[in-house]
Amino acid sequence: MTDPGYAARIKELLRHVQVASRQDLELLKYGRHFRLPGGAKAVVGRTERENEAIETLISSGDFLLQVDQYPGPLVLVGGAVSGEDLEVAAGLAAAYSDAPQGTPVTVTAEPGGSDRVFRLTTPTKDRFKPWLV
């Protein structure tokens, strides 16, 4: 645990859960982590390898978001996920995708079978800095 980023992620996680699951700890190894306004946790893959790893760590009740028209990250959202948190996570998926800023995109959120679709304009990454862990 010599990586200061990993240590900070563990501290942040333990402020929000009483007991960390194996999945919680495994997810700390991958992606960019955001604590969303409603308290849900979002993990944004940085590479294809991280996207693949994140996809294997989905639990019941989690959402997996992805931009439909452009390459980009998978965004895993877990915890008590509000509608607002899902909208913010859709913005994360768009901002970190290859879609040019200001481009209209569609983001699909998959919670184990029933999809939710968000249509938005690609925001800047700076919009999400307040929630970066």
Q: Language-model segments: which ranges?
A:
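Nucleotide-activated chemistry modules centered on ATP-dependent adenylation/adenylyltransferase
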Residues: 1-76, 82-83, 96-100
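RNA-binding accessory domains that recognize and position tRNA/RNA substrates
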Residues: 26, 33, 60, 68-73, ...
